[in-house]
Amino acid sequence: MVETYAFLDPGSNTSFCTDQLTERLGATRMKTTLSLTTTSHKDAKSQSLVVCLEISDPCGNHTIELPNVFSRPSLPVTIDDIPRQTDVDRWAYLNGIHIPHIDAEIELLVGNDATKVLEPKEIRESKDGVPSTVRTLFG
């Protein structure tokens, strides 16, 4: 088992992980060609590895299989994108939300191909332009 942060991205139709994560897990990888469309490129072909991953929440209460996760050298998010407890504590309407801290990078991007992972369980709506938040099975 490896601990990492996951970026839940409903704007992506595919899930991705870092090459480094697949290596640390010793995951079985299969070569494939990936067609990526972004705001700056359309149908850009790229060699990738596809893996099957099983993810669980920090307490191990919920586990879901992600059957087609594409491996990339890096993901378009950084450690600075990870919310911290001090961020949440700034707003009273977010009271009761606990963000666990782990010593890890963001090595998994979960797209809308994993709808159960993205499914909202609780929504804290934005007030006066400050952040809103969504709780899922995974936090």
What kind of region is each of these model predictions?
Residues M1-G139:
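Aspartic protease
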